[in-house]
Amino acid sequence: WEQRKLGEIASFSKGSGYSKADIRESGIPLFLYGRMYTQYETRVDSVDTFAAPRPGTLYSKGTEIVVPASGESAEDIARASAITREGIALGGDLNVVYPQRMVTPLFLAYGLSHGSSQELLAQKAQGKTVVHIHASDLKGLGIAFPDVTEQQAIGTFFSSLDDLITLHQRK
């Protein structure tokens, strides 16, 4: 496994200013940061919220992960979702991380949402009533990763487990 700082293997952006008030019956698909606290998805390949398109919107490429920029606690904010579909508008209050090809988005999302990386991410959160995390905080996180083939196998395994859990919860 290789160990690198996230800032060495990824670039960063911020979601655009969409909020819950912008939700419409139809329009462009929209991912809002609140979904991370209601759906708890590590892999996002579809959304059920829509908004009217507007200039300056940041759309997913299908290869990024999102990390909330704010939350109620350090533990809440220490999570990530891989956006695996192109063309989803990324709403406000999201840190958007574009990993280089040496790291798969799904593997990185699982890594940041669990274990020692999640603990380190929680430690970076700042604030009392509302905690925040910025791209500059994310850049310094140490990330360990195997080769891409193994990352894909790990991501597929955990994604299959998530799907199975979701299926059983619906019963």
Predicted ranges, named:
Residues G7-K20, G34-G62:
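Sequence-specific dsDNA recognition surfaces
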Residues Y37-F50, I65-G91, L106-Y110, E119-Q123:
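Short, ligand-facing micro-motifs at secondary-structure edges
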